[in-house]
Design a protein with these regions (language model features):
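Compositional signal for N-terminal targeting/processing segments
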Residues: 1-201
Length: 201
């Protein structure tokens, strides 16, 4: 499993900013000890079918794209988000759009993502107990509604109860923009990493 960071990755920029300004930071996605175990554990036929249905359903942002006259979600996101000169005003709009998508297309959220989001909320609650004045969350747009509207703690605990675990080891590996591209086979890749590097600068 690889977690590639490019210079323009929001997570990497957040880490660098935190280090430079002596601000506590932490990863809050589901740890690999659980994530890898969930991938290797035998799932029930129903869970397997659900995951397959999510994959077959495609990119939920395609719905927004088609409504706005774009051919696909990738080109819509590129134009409306990545090239926006003043990105701050788009966050609320994206949250509202994704909230509507998740309500209308509940099948697009996989069982594994529901577990991940329960863990994210657990980490947010832990940070809130430390009485930080402000907490900044860097995550994918699809997860925003699930982190904004927090369910009961016991509901999340039920989702996380009895998660399987495996031993893991981590290391730093040099990574190229070719590997970050979709064409490399990287599922969460982007179309043209070099282009985004140019935009960042």
């Amino acid at each position: 499993v690889f977690y590639p960071f490019a210079e323009f990755s929001p997570e990497w920029q957040a880490i660098r900013y935190a280090v430079q300004n002596r601000i506590p930071f932490r990863f809050f996605d589901l740890p690999l000890i659980y994530s890898l175990a969930l991938r290797t554990e035998k799932t029930s036929e129903q869970e397997t079918e659900t995951t397959a249905e999510v994959a077959e359903a495609g990119d939920p942002f395609d719905w927004l794209a088609h409504a706005a006259g774009f051919t696909d979600g990738e080109s819509w996101w590129e134009t409306m988000i990545e090239h926006r000169q003043e990105p701050a005003d788009i966050f609320q709009a994206v949250q509202e759009a994704v909230t509507a998508l998740r309500e209308e297309l509940p099948g697009h959220t996989s069982p594994r993502d529901l577990i991940r989001e329960a863990w994210m909320r657990k980490m947010i609650r832990a940070a809130q107990k430390e009485n930080f004045e402000r907490i900044v969350v860097v995550c994918g747009a699809w997860h925003v509604p699930a982190l904004d509207d927090m369910p009961k703690v016991k509901d999340d605990n039920e989702l996380l109860k009895g998660l399987p675990k495996v031993k893991v080891e981590c290391t730093w590996i040099p990574w190229t923009y070719d590997r970050l591209a979709f064409r490399s086979g990287y599922g969460a890749g982007i179309e043209s990493p070099g282009w985004y590097h140019y935009l960042w600068h």
